């Protein structure tokens, strides 16, 4: 397969991308034309903040061509349809895309993730992996594995914040505790909690896809839990409330999350950078004293017990 590569200005990139798709290309991506140079302009900001730069000044539009397509004809058609300067058709190039088994390649990038000696996150294509304790005879008898494939919802166990919350659940979760996972994503924390001995478990997310993903993943892992949107969350307190989101939403949600923790219950927060820990803890100070439970790769897990 081949890719058509063309540099253009910021104002032209969207219209050209749409027109290329209408002209029959298989996919379009837009990259920084100055990537890897001193002029490169990263778009990302800090977690929970808006990026300072919203678009690149010079864009590189990359279109994946169908087999046998005439790149010059497709480009001219797209430029005309978008009402752009015909001179834009000069200076394009082609690059070969090596054939690959994309499914196998993707799967190779997601292996089993050990959270501890006995707790593992295991993609479905590693169900019979002898390297994972508890998946084959004669392996660790008390091993717990959570079957989870990468999907539309956040949470595969690879991010430090997910790892931190899983580690807390394994080390500190009271047996039979009623638990709320707020911002559940894939449902990984709620599912882990159930497998680690939690009682009634409720998973909440603002994204309907995440709620459905949690339902599906719970079924795969043969655990019972409730998954819902925030408006459907019934009244009541929980012995454990865990929220792995970002620092700004955590601060905004402080009254609600703290209010959901029963007296003597635990609040576990992550999605917080080390330098953000104090300001997040301060947001919860009227209700709980939060402190850093553990740090991993610049991220922290905050924990507090409600008086």
UniProtKB/Swiss-Prot annotation:
One of its GO terms (molecular function) is protein-lysine N-methyltransferase activity. Gene3D superfamilies: Vaccinia Virus protein VP39. It is an enzyme of class 2 (transferase). One of its GO terms (cellular component) is cytosol. The keyword Methyltransferase applies. Pfam families: PrmA (PF06325). Its EC number is 2.1.1.-. Keywords: Cytoplasm, Methyltransferase, S-adenosyl-L-methionine, Transferase. It comes from the Bacteria. The keyword Cytoplasm applies. It is found in: Cytoplasm. S-adenosyl-L-methionine binds at residues 162, 183, 205, 244. One of its GO terms (biological process) is methylation. It catalyses: L-lysyl-[protein] + 3 S-adenosyl-L-methionine = N(6),N(6),N(6)-trimethyl-L-lysyl-[protein] + 3 S-adenosyl-L-homocysteine + 3 H(+). Methylates ribosomal protein L11. PANTHER family: ELECTRON TRANSFER FLAVOPROTEIN BETA SUBUNIT LYSINE METHYLTRANSFERASE. Belongs to the methyltransferase superfamily. PrmA family. This is Ribosomal protein L11 methyltransferase. The lineage of its organism: Bacteria, Pseudomonadati, Pseudomonadota, Betaproteobacteria, Burkholderiales.
